[in-house]
Regions:
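Short glycine/serine- and small hydrophobic-enriched flexible loop segments
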Residues: 337-340
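Active-site/pore-lining binding-face segments in mid-to-C-terminal subdomains
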Residues: 155-237
Length: 340
């Protein structure tokens, strides 16, 4: 039987189809890198100078043959390619393909394209983050029967603004009752250059509160509850608390067995966190748990689909720079996957 949970997932990633242009010849980049290394040696630059990043910054932002063939960072290297985005479900079945050409950007004037930095990884993250919501909006507009439920993406989408758009409001339209359509959960790893903070409690890198007397001791998640107002909250308790039976009443109650308790309560410390206050820290699920780890592994299905398109269906290595040809090949690859 088909796994309904995986079928309800929405996974996004981007890549590019390398075009047959001079700039993609390895000799082109190697010549520039060699010149920059010689320049750095002559100017006595220290070890912090990176000739590869300098080469990326000094190379043109698009191919001389066609301005639509952009300099991109894909599959661990920078090249000149047509960029596209692909959405699959957790089964790896393609749901939507966005070809990021002039027509796409004319349809989405809200996307602001800025000049590149000297970091290819940073450029890719910034560009992918700006393309995510418009691509998903196109998906759900084209397929109104699809419901956003669980989103999986990489750390490029780790920003407070994107969590708010993904998990609240009517980002993807409204249903028949006028209720806003948005995802219930988002599995996005944190970019640890920007850690988590909580004004009320001390939390670890996964957003789990920890003991005030022992930062290495995370509190134990005890599930979620919904208040009468409909607000969801997470409950955490001291991991050194055990349920014990009272011989006189026959009832069970909590007993804290900590030798250095952080609270005077015999039940031990309890913490309630309201995820709506910080969707980045609590995107409908908890990081650092077995459920998170097992679910996020499924994200690689979109990468396998991209590799299938490029390797099995022959998108990689196409000796053409014609946009319409490569766009058609990309769509035909998606259709072929659905047929086979």
């Amino acid at each position: 039987a088909i796994d309904s949970c995986k079928a309800d997932m929405t996974i996004f990633d981007s890549s590019g189809i390398e075009a047959w242009v001079t700039e993609n010849n390895p000799k082109y980049a190697n010549r520039i890198i060699k010149q920059l290394k010689a320049y750095a040696k002559a100017m006595h630059f220290d070890d912090s100078y990176d000739p590869y990043k300098a080469a990326y910054g000094s190379m043109p932002s698009h191919s001389a043959a066609n301005s639509d063939i952009k300099q991109l960072y894909i599959d661990g290297h920078f090249c000149y390619a047509y960029k596209f985005g692909i959405v699959t479900n957790g089964l790896g079945i393609v749901r939507h393909i966005s070809f990021y050409n002039k027509d796409f950007f004319d349809h989405h004037p809200e996307i602001i394209l800025e000049k590149k930095s000297d970091s290819p990884e940073e450029d890719k993250s910034v560009h992918d983050a700006r393309l995510l919501i418009p691509s998903l909006q196109d998906l759900f507009a084209a397929h109104p029967l699809l419901n956003p439920h669980t989103f999986l993406g990489d750390a490029a989408f780790d920003s407070a603004g994107l969590y708010k758009q993904l998990l609240s409001g009517s980002t993807f339209g409204t249903d028949s009752n006028g209720t806003g359509r948005h995802f219930q959960k988002a599995y996005i790893p944190l970019n640890y250059r920007a850690g988590l903070e909580n004004k009320d409690y001390s939390v670890n890198q996964d957003g789990i509160p920890f003991c005030p007397n022992d930062p290495s001791l995370p509190l134990k998640p005890e599930g979620t509850s919904r208040l009468r107002s409909g607000v969801i909250r997470y409950k955490f308790s001291c991991p050194k608390v055990k349920w014990e039976k009272d011989a006189s009443t026959g009832k069970y109650h909590r007993v804290c067995h900590c030798k250095n308790p952080c609270t005077s309560s015999p039940c031990g410390r309890m913490v309630y966190i309201y995820p709506e206050k910080d969707l980045r820290a609590y995107p409908g699920t908890l990081r650092g748990t077995t459920v998170w780890d097992n679910t996020y592994k499924i994200r690689t299905t979109v990468e396998r689909s991209i590799n299938q398109f490029k390797d099995s269906f022959g998108l990689a290595g196409r000796k053409t720079q014609n946009e319409k040809t490569l766009h058609a090949d990309l769509l035909l690859a998606g259709i072929t996957q659905l047929i086979v």
